[in-house]
């Protein structure tokens, strides 16, 4: 394979025999070079490097630039814009040695100092005792909710028993198996010889 430099990028051309309809290698290799420029000439500022060209048979195939080249071009363009606006200083290339990150806030936002002794939320209340009695922890307890519901029902006219009726809710024992028909086949009709598994 023959390799030729094309403005800083390698161009590979296959040296094949003459094929019908194929352009000669010398014509295809020099087609992209403007007259008067050498192959190793550097790029001017703002001039794009040509894409890498590869000849496959009678065709010239351009390869897309790599992602690293695209990212570098994007970074260089962003630096140039910031330099023109005067926002790019000499301190941007030096990493921060203190280990702390500085945070930039958008317009209208202020930073909260989140020290443990400072409340992030303030509630309007006349007394702190009332606040602590209703919201003693982050979770509402079931007893507190139950008392509030009972108080509201009493105000609405419903009279609830003060003693819960848990004792009255015992389950009724089931009937003996011998007195009823077999549940598996209904054939026994009280015969004790059939047992349930």
Swiss-Prot record:
Positions of modified residues (Phosphoserine): 14, 125, 127
Keyword Phosphoprotein: yes
Leader sequence segment: none
Phosphoprotein in keyword set: yes
Record InterPro entries: FAM219
Pfam families tied to this protein: FAM219A
Region of interest: Disordered: 1-77, 117-142
Keywords, comma-separated and alphabetical: Phosphoprotein
Family label: Belongs to the FAM219 family.
Name this protein carries in UniProt: Protein FAM219B
Protein's organism: Mus musculus
Source lineage: Eukaryota, Metazoa, Chordata, Craniata, Vertebrata
């Amino acid at each position: 394979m023959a390799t030729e430099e094309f403005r800083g990028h390698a161009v590979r051309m296959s040296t094949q025999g003459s094929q019908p309809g194929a352009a000669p290698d010398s014509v295809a290799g020099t087609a992209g070079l403007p007259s008067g420029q050498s192959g190793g000439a550097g790029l001017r500022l703002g001039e794009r490097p040509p894409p890498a060209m590869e000849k496959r048979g009678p065709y010239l195939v351009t390869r897309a630039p790599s992602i690293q080249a695209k990212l570098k071009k994007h970074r260089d363009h962003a630096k140039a814009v910031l330099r023109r606006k005067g926002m790019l200083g000499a301190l941007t290339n030096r990493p921060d040695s203190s280990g702390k990150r500085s945070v930039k806030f958008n317009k209208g936002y202020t930073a909260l100092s989140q020290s443990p002794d400072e409340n992030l939320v303030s509630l309007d209340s006349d007394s702190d005792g009332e606040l602590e009695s209703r919201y003693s922890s982050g979770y509402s307890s079931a007893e507190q909710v139950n008392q509030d519901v009972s108080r509201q029902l009493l105000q609405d006219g419903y009279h609830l028993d003060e003693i819960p009726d848990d004792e009255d809710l015992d389950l009724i024992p089931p009937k003996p198996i011998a007195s009823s028909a077999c549940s598996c086949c209904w054939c026994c009709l009280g015969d004790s010889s059939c047992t349930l598994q």
